[in-house]
Curated annotation (Swiss-Prot):
It comes from Streptococcus equi subsp. equi (strain 4047). The active site is at 194 (proton acceptor). NCBIfam families: PRK00094.1-2, PRK00094.1-3, PRK00094.1-4. This is Glycerol-3-phosphate dehydrogenase [NAD(P)+]. Keywords: Cytoplasm, Lipid biosynthesis, Lipid metabolism, NAD, NADP, Nucleotide-binding, Oxidoreductase, Phospholipid biosynthesis, Phospholipid metabolism. NADPH binds at residues 13-14, 108, 143, 258, 282, 284. It is an enzyme of class 1 (oxidoreductase). The gene is gpsA.
C-alpha cells in the first residue's frame, strides 16, 4: 500500500498504540487532541506518559490541537474518543473536512440516551459525500501490549467490504493483523457489551471467588451478549470470533482491562466515584451497563448479568447479593441463548 495520511482523533492509550502501528507501516500519522500539555509532550518529548511511562514514540508521529490541520489532505480518519463525545467530535469533523476520506472508529460503547452504535452516529453526523462506509476496528487488544509490538489480531468490519479490506491492509504487519467482517452490528455490540461482563468478572475477583465463577460469568455473559445482538440484527457467528469471544476473554480476565479493574474495586467495596478518580481513564462498561439494561428492558431480552451489574451500580444494590441472586434464577437449557 502507498503511504497514507491518517488522522487519529483521541491520543489516549489505544489511539497512541494505533498511531505507532501505522507509523511502523510507513504511514503519516497525525494525532489530534484537546489537552495542550499532552500534545506538547508528544511533539517535544515523544512520549505520552499519562498512559505509557516508559515508551518513546517515533519522532515522525505528530500531534496537534488544530482539527483543521489534522484533517488537511487526509486519506483516513480514525475516531478513538470516548463514546459520550463521539457525536460532538463527528460534528466538528463534518464542519472542517473538505474532501472524502475513509472513516473508521476504534471505540467501544453505545451512546447514552439514544442507545445508538458509534458507526450510526458517524453516519448521521458526517455527510455521505465526505466519507466511506464506516469501518469498525475492534477485537482483543490491550494498548499496553500493542505499544510494545506484542502479537495482536483484531477485526475490521464494514458494510462495504472494500473499505474493510483497505483498513485491513492499512494496519496489518508482522505483529498486528486484521480480519474483515461485514457484520457491523455484531462487531460493535460485541465490543460494547463485553465491557459489562468484564465488570462482572472483575467483581467476582474482588469478592474473592475463583476461576469457576469467573468462567461462568464470562461464558454466560457471551450468551446474553449474543442474545441482545441477534435481536438487534447481528449474525450470531460474529460472537464466536475475535470481536466476540476473543475480546471477552482478554477484557474479562486481565488486570490490563480498566473495566475488569473497576469491577474488582466494586467487589472490594470501593465507591464508583473513587474508582473513576483513581483510574483517571474512561470506564466504558459503567455507562454501557445502563444503555444495555434499557435496551434489554425495551426489547424484552433476558440479560441477568447485565441486570445484576446495573442494579449494583445504579440502584445501590449490594453487588454480592446481586450476583448470588442469579443462582436462584429459573432453570434454563445452556443452548437457549437466543430466547
Amino acid at each position: 500500500m502507498p503511504k497514507q495520511k491518517v488522522a487519529i482523533l483521541g491520543p489516549g492509550s489505544w489511539g497512541t498504540a494505533l498511531a505507532q502501528v501505522l507509523n511502523d507501516n510507513g504511514h503519516e500519522v497525525r494525532l489530534w487532541g484537546n489537552i495542550p500539555e499532552q500534545i506538547n509532550e508528544i511533539n517535544t518529548r515523544h512520549t505520552n506518559s499519562h498512559y505509557f511511562k516508559d515508551i518513546v514514540l517515533d519522532e515522525a508521529i505528530k500531534a496537534t490541537l488544530d482539527l483543521k490541520e489534522a484533517l488537511a489532505d487526509i486519506d483516513a480518519i480514525l475516531f478513538v474518543v470516548p463514546t459520550k463525545v463521539t457525536r460532538l467530535v463527528a460534528k466538528q469533523v463534518a464542519q472542517v473536512l473538505d474532501h472524502k476520506a475513509i472513516v473508521m472508529h476504534a471505540s467501544k460503547g453505545l451512546e447514552p440516551g439514544t442507545h445508538e452504535r458509534l458507526s450510526t452516529i458517524l453516519e448521521e453526523e458526517i455527510p455521505a459525500q465526505l466519507r466511506s462506509e464506516v469501518v469498525v476496528v475492534s477485537g482483543p487488544s490491550h494498548a499496553e501490549e500493542t505499544i510494545v509490538r506484542d502479537i495482536t489480531l483484531i477485526t475490521a468490519a464494514s458494510k462495504d467490504i472494500t473499505a474493510a479490506r483497505y483498513v485491513q491492509t492499512l494496519f496489518s504487519n508482522h505483529y498486528f493483523r486484521l480480519y474483515t467482517n461485514t457484520d457491523v452490528i455484531g462487531v460493535e455490540t460485541a465490543g460494547a457489551l463485553k465491557n459489562i461482563i468484564a465488570v462482572g468478572a472483575g467483581a467476582l475477583h474482588g469478592l474473592g471467588y475463583g476461576d469457576n465463577a469467573k468462567a461462568a460469568v464470562i461464558t454466560r455473559g457471551l450468551a446474553e451478549i449474543t442474545r441482545l445482538g441477534v435481536k438487534l440484527g447481528a449474525d450470531p457467528l460474529t460472537y464466536s470470533g475475535l470481536s466476540g469471544v476473543g475480546d471477552l476473554i482478554v477484557t474479562g480476565t486481565s488486570v490490563h482491562s480498566r473495566n475488569w479493574r473497576a469491577g474488582a474495586a466494586l467487589g472490594r467495596g470501593e465507591k464508583l466515584k473513587d474508582i473513576e478518580n483513581n483510574m483517571g481513564m474512561v470506564i466504558e462498561g459503567i455507562s454501557t451497563t445502563k444503555v444495555a439494561y434499557e435496551i434489554a428492558q425495551e426489547l424484552g431480552v433476558y440479560m441477568p448479568i447485565t441486570s445484576a451489574i446495573y442494579k449494583s451500580i445504579y440502584e445501590g444494590a449490594d453487588i454480592k447479593e446481586s450476583i448470588l441472586g442469579m443462582m436462584s434464577n429459573e432453570f434454563r437449557s445452556e443452548n437457549e441463548w437466543h430466547t
